[in-house]
Amino acid sequence: MDRFVGLAAGFGRAARDCHEPGRLARLMAYARDDFPRALVHEWRSAALGHWDRHRSVADGEASEPEAGEKLLLYGTTLIGAVLTPWLFVAWQIGDGDLAVVEHDGALLRPLAPAEEDLGDETESLCGAEAWRAVRTHWAPQFDEARGPRLVVLSTDGLSKSFASADGYREFVVGLDDRLTEEGADGVRAVLPQWLRQASRYSGDDTTLVAALRPEHLALEAEEKTES
């Protein structure tokens, strides 16, 4: 994850000037093509470096595994996003969920695959050409007040805790309602309990991160919708 954070921070800095002529098109090309390749390269370097540093002394006389075999031991999925006032980009490989509540309350899952993975099988960063499996959500925000009011990223342990996709959608809608009524502090206090309960149902780890639009922008969006 730290490798993603480093790349995402650099992308976020570059996105500050996305209104320069031609800049948005270059950023889109980088987000869809170069960023996934850079992410996989950084992850592979970190994984193989860890192998070299922590290889068991007892394995000293054993034949050296191929790089692909080493990477299988570190295989992982990833979902992450960059949010700026004028640009929203997200990347995903493997399982996990991105839910977006738009300014008008519509709920979208823009990175949901056309076909769900069977069982526990999923794409992973350890794949031979993993960058090809990275899904990208690209959404310029030409009107800051109409940007998404809530973005939720979570591991698949959360969505799997529900009997159907409708249950997950209802959870996100409920989260949005609670944030509106109680504020971030109130939800933050009870969220760990919700996630522990979800983990018990799914039998898998459950992690969630959310970004909530500042209240003054939400009010501006409501005023524009009414007008």
Per-range role (PLM):
Residues 1-227:
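PP2C/PPM-type serine/threonine phosphatase catalytic domain
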